[in-house]
Amino acid sequence: MAEGPSLHPKLQVASNIPIELSSQIPQDPARNLAFQMCQNPLMTPGSTMQSRLSVPERNLLQQESQGPTRQSGRMPLSDRYVNKQTGPMALRKFRKERTVYSKEQQCLLQKHFDEFQYPNEKKIVELALSVGVTKREIKIWFKNNRAKYRRMKLQNIKQALPETNESSKAVSESTHFPGSIPVVDSDNGESMCSGTFGEDSIPKLNCSQESSLHCFQACDGDMCCPQEYQEYQEYLLHGHAPVTAWNSGQSAAFESQTDLAVAEVPVGLAYAAQAPEDAHNSGPCEDELWQRILEDLDTSDDWLTLRNLSTPVYTTEVLDQSKPYSHEEVCYTHL
C-alpha cells in the first residue's frame, strides 16, 4: 500500500482511511452511491448517475476532437493555398472583369444606338459577331448607354429651366409698369431718381393752383385776354409756365403733371430748378395789392355795379407765402 502524504500523526490516520476503504469496498452500485452521498451531502442520486454516464462520453469527444487537430497539424499545406487570404473575405464572390471596347467598336455600337436604342434579338446577334463579343455583353452595353443617355437628357433639362425662369422674370419686371418714365438730368445725362414716375407719383394741385388753372381756362373760352391766352398756349406747347403766375412749388407741381402729355420730363425738371428765385421776387406784396384795389374803388363811380369800368383784365399775382391770409390769389380790375 502506498503511503500518504507526510502529515501530523493524528491526521495521518484519518487521511489514510478513505484510501483503504475505497480499495476494500466492493463495486456495488447501490452501496457505492450511498458511500459517495455520505462523503458529499450535496450530491443527489440523479446527478451521480448522470456524472458516471457522462464520463465515457466526454473521453470519446475529447479523443475525436484532438484526433483531427493532430492529424491536420502534421499535414502539409498545398501550393494552391499558399500566400492567399483565408477567412470570411475569401468567401466573397469573384468579380467579373469589365469588357473594354476599342474606338472602332464603340463607334460601331454608337452608330447602331443612334438608330435604335432597343435592338431585337437578330440585331444583337449581328452586332455580337461584328464586334467580337457575346450577346450578353452587347445587351449590357446598350443598357448602360440608355441609362447614360437618360442622365444627360435630365441634366440638360435642369440647366435649361433656370434660364427660362430668369428671362421670364426680366420680361415681367420690364412690362410691369408700361407707363413709367425714367427721369434724367438734361445737363450731364445722369438719372436724378432711381424710382419710376407713374400716375401715383404726380403731385396734386392745391386751391391756388386750381383757381389759377380755371382762370386760364376762362380766358381760353371767353378770349378776353389775348396776352395771357398766348402765354397759356405757349405753356401747353413747350412746357414752360409764365414766371409771373407761379411760385417755385406751384410751377414744379403743375409742370410735373402736364409734362407726361405735352412735354419731356427733363425740360420741366430743369425749369423747376431755375424758377424759384424769379418767381418769388416777381409777385407784389399784400399791401401793394390792397392799395391797388382801394385805388380802383375810389376811381370808380359805382363800385357796386362797376358799370363804368373798362373791359376787365384778369391777372394772377402770387402773394407772400410767409404771411397768413385767407386768399392766396387776388383777381383785380385795372382801368
UniProtKB/Swiss-Prot annotation:
Question: Is this entry keyworded DNA-binding?
Answer: yes
Q: Which PANTHER family match?
A: HOMEOBOX PROTEIN, OBOX1-RELATED
Record-given protein name: Oocyte-specific homeobox protein 3
Transmembrane domains' residue ranges: none
Q: What is known about what this protein does?
A: Transcription factor required for zygotic genome activation (ZGA), a critical event in early embryonic development during which the developmental control passes from maternally provided mRNAs to the expression of the zygotic genome after fertilization. Together with other Obox family members, required in early two-cell stage embryos to kick-start the major ZGA wave by facilitating RNA Polymerase II 'pre-configuration', during which RNA Polymerase II relocates from the initial one-cell stage binding targets to ZGA gene promoters and distal enhancers.
Source organism of this protein record? Mus musculus (Mouse)
Phenotype upon knockout is: No visible phenotype; mice are viable and fertile. Female mice lacking maternally transcribed Obox1, Obox2, Obox5, Obox7 as well as zygotically expressed Obox3 and Obox4 are infertile: embryos arrest at two-four cell stage due to impaired zygotic genome activation (ZGA).
Provide GO CC annotations from the record: nucleus
- Record GO terms (molecular function): DNA binding; DNA-binding transcription factor activity, RNA polymerase II-specific
Q: Gene name, please?
A: Obox3
Q: Which GO terms describe its biological process?
A: maternal-to-zygotic transition of gene expression
